[in-house]
Amino acid sequence: MLPEFTPVNNLTTQMAQQEIATLQKRLTDYGVAYYEEDAPLVEDYIYDAFYARLVLLEAQFPQFVTPDSPTQNVGGAKVKSGLAKVVHPAPMLSLGDVFSLEELQEWDERTTKTLGFQSEYNLELKIDGLAVALTYVDGKLVQASTRGNGSIGEDVTANVKTIRSIPQTLTEPITIEVRGEIYMPKSSFATLNKQREADGLEPFANPRNAAAGSLRQLNVAITKKRELSAFVYYTADPDAIGVTTQSGALERFAALGLPTDDHNRVIATMADIDAYIAEYTSQRERLAYGIDGVVVKVNQLDNQLDLGHTVKIPRWAIAYKFPPEEALTVVRDIEWTVGRTGAVTPTAVMDPVQLAGTTVQRASLHNPDYLNAKDIRIGDTVTLHKAGDIIPEIGQVLLAERPANNQVYDIPTFCPACHSELVHLDGEVALRCINPFCVAQIQEKLTHFASRNAMNIDGMGPRVVSQLLKANYIQDVASIYRLQETQLLSLDKFKEKSVTNLLSAITTSKSNSLERLLFGLGIRMVGAKAARLIAEKFKTLQAIADASVIDIASIAGIGETIALSVVQYFKTPEAKQLLIELQEAGVNQTYLSDVIVDETSFFYGKKIVLTGKLEKGSRTEATKWLQDHGAQVTGSVSAKTDLLIAGEDAGSKLDKANALGVTVWDEQAFIEAQAKEGTDK
């Protein structure tokens, strides 16, 4: 849900400076999640709205524009550890966006005014994928790279060579760099997510994220299995293929054997552009691949040169972004769930509808204020959109369709899980259960503690946590480390192998660095980033527990609100006792990332899993050595695992690694690699 922006004319200089700084940070964080982690935090239209607001403010207050502002840099990912850097011979620019036909008309008028005449345009579908540059020398594919930050990308040559639609040899022995989009066809995306769910893995949010995550793999075998495809649409060296227009370039690309999208169209009027947009707005779901808009390009290449570009975008092209796709549905119920911090969140349960290629029947209503502001009632007909193919959201209530006897929805006053009275804390919009013994909160806290981004205890998901709670085998996070084999074997569907795997994952989690433990404790307002910043500063959990609000708030990126939350947490008797019990269990409470890591190490940046019994030392020692050399040691095998080190009696993890095509080493191979690294690194 977008905030109401203050009109620019009503802003003081100080207010503008503060809002610009906030927007720059927010958009940077969104960009990191989208480009680097392939896990977007918000829908595209929300990002676009914040970005447009930042552009407007920076235009009005140029003294606050900074070199690292998202408006001054090409969107893209930083280079992933383990992938070589590639310097682009010419910058890989982003496209400017417009979101209405009126804005597109304004762009056309500016372009016409600059050129002095009405230009011919080439229209292309905006493929929802990952930008890539392909370099051919004498007709042979020698390098492929991602956009990265626009100047430096990642070398993904080996991965791209597994994509069948990209030729390794052109039909002519020419030397050229071309650019295009790697995407995942809808059918491949559906198959991949079905398999991931069967394997107990989290499905990808959308085909774009799946394509990005698949291309940026260190394990080429994984990329090959993902069935990616590509379209080529640009070269910075048109003379190499003897063309003078964008449409001519597409024809030459096809003649060279390169994959091109054949839906492009050369037009001359805005009416033609409107018709093209209308045509593919209605047809987008029938295409075999995802599109999120239409790209309008000046067709004559010499006119493109005349128009030039800014530091970030070309002036000769613009992307029209499709509005969020909408569907009509009926709200049948409103359910309330309790989170780990006690926040009670409403969710609308609706008649299932097809939206952006998936079936949707639930949408978060966020908090009581949101629910009241929209006046959503059971039985209402509502519009539903899923912009960016990510988060379903109710748009508006169709009041004309509301049943005559439809009553205002009553906000609950008691917790749906423990039936304690709900409260509104000062300054919060959330409805909250403050009962520390609420079973729903305890379940969510334990599930969070074991989650991948916290202590990463593989095999301890919501179902297992629920079983353990019902059996009274665990009560808090410390009790996880007191679990016994006999207890686990008494649970439904637990066999000897699964028990061994879970106990092994619990043991492995003891060696995690402090920031994971701090995040796993589930302190209100302390996310993964804040946990890392605090851990870096104080080094030990006890030092954090002893710190004052002023000490913690002095950390860049940590405000007084977060600092107060941390101090209040560690003042409680329960937290003090928990620290003692975690220490007694042997859980590391020290920040481990002060080791100076050699970024040239083979292990740097790789996700590695250890399994089985090691003869030349313990798994804990091996884990510490790998972490000191920049590896991320995890407890479970997934498609993102780079290497499995298998000792004696390796079990299901080895089977899964082989099934996923993950590289597997025995202990001797690991020892030899350690020797090559040198003991002084």
Swiss-Prot record:
Q: Which organism is it from?
A: Leuconostoc citreum (strain KM20)
GO-annotated molecular function:
DNA binding; DNA ligase (NAD+) activity; metal ion binding
Please report the name of this protein according to its UniProt entry.
DNA ligase
- Residues annotated as binding NAD(+) are D44, Y45, I46, Y47, D48, S94, L95, E124, R147, E181, K297, K321
Which residues does UniProt mark as catalytic? Answer: K126 (n6-amp-lysine intermediate)
Signal peptide (UniProt feature, chain positions): none
User: Which controlled-vocabulary keywords does the entry list?
Assistant: DNA damage, DNA repair, DNA replication, Ligase, Magnesium, Manganese, Metal-binding, NAD, Zinc
InterPro entries reported for this sequence: BRCT_dom, BRCT_dom_sf, DisA/LigA_HHH, DNA_ligase, DNA_ligase_AS, DNA_ligase_CS, DNAligase_adenylation, DNAligase_N
* Known catalytic reactions: NAD(+) + (deoxyribonucleotide)n-3'-hydroxyl + 5'-phospho-(deoxyribonucleotide)m = (deoxyribonucleotide)n+m + AMP + beta-nicotinamide D-nucleotide
TM regions (residue ranges): none
Q: Name one GO cellular component term.
A: cytosol
